[in-house]
């Protein structure tokens, strides 16, 4: 190609590319005018009620509601909007700061008495997300409030108050357009946990039939292990976790879920986080961007309906105000 022709070509194509890029990211991440979310007719994917496909592309921000202020939430969500994320996964009753404290979500630590000021803040977080066309994958509580295990606790839920809390949330957020409910929170659905999680889910669904719902299990497990036949579980979520590096974990979890009846969509709601120590041990090294892309490709090319990204520093909204969890290295 003659040099002058090449220069003319660049003069034409470069502004066009810049314009396309600006147009691509100037609007909302998701156009809510296509209607609420639902499961596709073949049971494999998610879509809007008008038939427009929906890609669940999540980011992990478990501690966002508890730890960030409004300017910080605005900054974070704008960053995620420009990157093309469609869902932000976060928690109402967070893990790291318990169920009570300075920014208390509950009065006297009881799920029967939600703090009005805290839930006005939850409302505002949902509103900011909605303004940017972002869904919020909203966990009513982290799992340690049902089953303490390695968490901070305390255990505050039983079958009765879990159902009551679910009904309260369902009534409050039934008309909020940009919610995807996520029951659980890094815990098993076995034993007594089953009845508590089931009651919470059913309580929400009694008052809110608008929104999709799934369950977030502990590492290397799937919601299908306990809840696949539950009518409230619209799609399965598994956690491939932070220890495995090959396809075997997807063969065991994702492919297994795809073969279950009734057919339900499935996605990895917690794959290996970027910059987290492998198997939680710093001497093993850390997962990097290559490892993240590998989990994305393995999920999507195997038939998942979406994918959730996570970063070790971002999920905990780490800053110098807090002690680092899992050897976090930089601020969020």
Cite the ranges covered by each PLM segment.
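Bacterial N-terminal signal peptides that target proteins for export
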Residues: 1-6
């Amino acid at each position: 190609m003659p040099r002058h022709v090449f220069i003319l070509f660049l003069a034409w194509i470069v502004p066009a590319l810049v314009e396309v890029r600006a147009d691509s990211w100037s609007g909302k991440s998701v156009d809510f005018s296509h209607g609420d979310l639902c499961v596709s007719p073949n049971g494999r994917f998610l879509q809007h009620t008008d038939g427009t496909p929906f890609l669940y592309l999540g980011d992990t921000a478990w501690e966002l509601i508890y730890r960030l202020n409004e300017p910080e939430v605005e900054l974070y969500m704008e960053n995620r909007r420009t990157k093309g994320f469609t869902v932000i996964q976060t928690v109402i009753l967070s893990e790291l700061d318990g169920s009570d404290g300075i920014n208390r979500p509950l009065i006297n630590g009881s799920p029967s008495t939600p703090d009005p000021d805290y839930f006005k803040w939850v409302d505002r977080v949902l509103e900011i997300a909605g303004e940017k066309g972002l869904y919020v994958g909203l966990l009513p509580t982290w799992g340690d409030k049902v089953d303490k295990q390695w968490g901070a606790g305390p255990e505050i839920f039983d079958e009765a108050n879990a159902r009551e809390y679910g009904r309260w949330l369902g009534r409050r957020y039934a008309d909020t357009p940009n919610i995807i409910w996520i029951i659980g929170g890094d815990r098993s659905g076995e034993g007594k946990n089953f009845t508590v999680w089931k009651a919470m889910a059913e309580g929400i669904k009694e008052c809110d039939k608008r929104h999709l719902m799934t369950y977030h299990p502990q590492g290397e497990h799937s919601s299908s292990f306990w809840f696949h036949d539950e009518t409230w579980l619209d799609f399965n979520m598994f956690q491939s976790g932070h220890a495995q590096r090959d396809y075997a974990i997807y063969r065991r979890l994702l492919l297994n879920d795809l073969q279950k009846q009734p057919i339900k969509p499935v996605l990895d709601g917690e794959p290996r986080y970027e910059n987290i120590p492998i198997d939680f041990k710093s001497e093993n090294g850390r997962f990097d961007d290559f490892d993240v892309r590998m989990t994305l490709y393995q999920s999507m090319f195997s038939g998942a309906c979406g994918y959730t990204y996570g970063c070790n520093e971002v999920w905990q909204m780490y800053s110098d105000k807090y002690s680092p969890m899992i050897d976090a290295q930089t601020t969020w």
